[in-house]
Amino acid sequence: MADLIDVIDDVLSPELCTQLIARFEKSPNLTQGKTGGGVDLDKKRSIDVSISQRPEFADLFKQVMQLTGEQLVKYIEKYYYALVGPIGLTVRHPKTGEPVKLTGENFEEVGKPNLHNLVNYLFRIGDINAQRYTAGNGGYPYWHSEVYPQAPHNEALHRVLLFMFYLNDVEEGGETEFYYQDKAVKPKAGRMVI
């Protein structure tokens, strides 16, 4: 059975990775990394900045989101029950225009032709952070889930997928580990994990 973790190399170009790192280093908006409960150095040790909300990242964020969208559509095409399963979606048949319930059985015929629009309509991107972990000291050494209630909007409860990019190569350490899948992903510049 699939572990549902896709590792896609070279999604971000070396130039884009370098630009993101340089912009990060110059940003006046760097903050101590936070968990759902705020700053907790026992759980997360990083320096973060929102690249989706800070104007100094606007041009780079647009490029990252274009590339992210392309990969998310491919991911949902591969694991289409992430789209079909959560809600009983009714869509227009691409040939007849008649309303039809989208199912796993008719996904190829009914869902796939309009997949890009369905993904854009049903999923939303939350706040996107760039994070720096210091070798030998940084990290998120706490097994955690990305789903937790947090007032006032409970944004994390809307999360369906996690995606991340690595902006640099790390020779030793720095892996992102997935507990139940017994999988560790090594950082490599341009690599995306969904």
Where are these regions (language model features)?
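Fe(II)/2-oxoglutarate oxygenase catalytic core
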Residues: 1-192
